[in-house]
Regions:
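Beta-hairpin "wing" of winged helix-turn-helix
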Residues: 63-78
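N-terminal leader segment of winged-helix/HTH proteins
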Residues: 1-22, 157-159, 165-174
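Residues within the helices of the helix-turn-helix
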Residues: 42, 60, 80
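C-terminal regulatory/oligomerization modules of transcriptional regulators
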Residues: 96, 100-175
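Basic, amphipathic "hinge/linker" alpha-helix immediately C-terminal to the N-terminal HTH DNA-binding motif
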Residues: 23, 74-95
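N-terminal helix-turn-helix DNA-binding core of bacterial DNA-binding proteins
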Residues: 13-54
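Residue-level detection of the helix-turn-helix DNA-binding "recognition helix"
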Residues: 46, 59-60, 64
């Protein structure tokens, strides 16, 4: 992101609302457990070592925000299954990126498990920021530009052309 950019005009940024839902460790640990197939309250509690009241409030919040679904079990309506929704599955790359960041920069205990591609049996690559054509981008190659509400595919700004977006980026950097 090279030269400093004025970001005061980004009140509509979605990062604060995402952090409101997922911005504390138990939420991501519950997400990780759900990715690993855990579905029931007791199993989340046993796996994570989380207090019942905290687990209960986090599950309620994750259901309210559409990250998990809450479904009574057919065989016993008193028992509930919590499963990832499409919205929750959309958080998996963020969870993996946070884990990879922690593995690289944290001084905690080393990870004892790898995330592996089932087909190839190889560890996944590091999460990266990719260009539209698949190139890995560095921080100095990125630039925030204003985009009309609800349109974040890059085509909405600058008439949909790469030239228009480059021009907007140059303008944002130069002030």
């Amino acid at each position: 992101m090279g030269p400093k950019q004025d970001i005061t005009g980004f009140e509509g940024c979605s990062l604060p609302s995402a952090l409101e839902v997922m911005g504390e460790r138990w939420s991501f640990l519950i997400l990780r457990a759900a990715v690993n197939g855990i579905e029931h309250f007791e199993d989340f509690q046993a796996s994570l070592g989380i207090a019942r009241n905290i687990l209960s409030s986090r599950l309620v919040k994750l259901v309210e925000h559409g990250i998990l679904s809450r479904t009574p079990m057919e065989e016993d309506k008193r028992k509930v299954a919590y499963r990832l929704t499409a919205k929750g599955q959309g958080l998996v790359p963020a969870m993996v990126a946070l884990r990879q960041w922690g593995e690289k920069w944290s001084k905690g205990a080393p990870c004892t498990s790898l995330l592996v591609d089932r087909r190839d049996g190889l560890p996944i690559r590091a999460i990266a920021i990719l260009s539209a054509d698949g190139r890995e981008l560095g921080l100095d190659e990125l630039c925030w530009v204003d985009s009309p509400v609800g349109q974040d595919d890059g085509r909405a700004f600058g008439g949909g052309s790469p030239e228009g977006l480059r021009s907007a980026c140059d303008k944002a950097i130069s002030g």
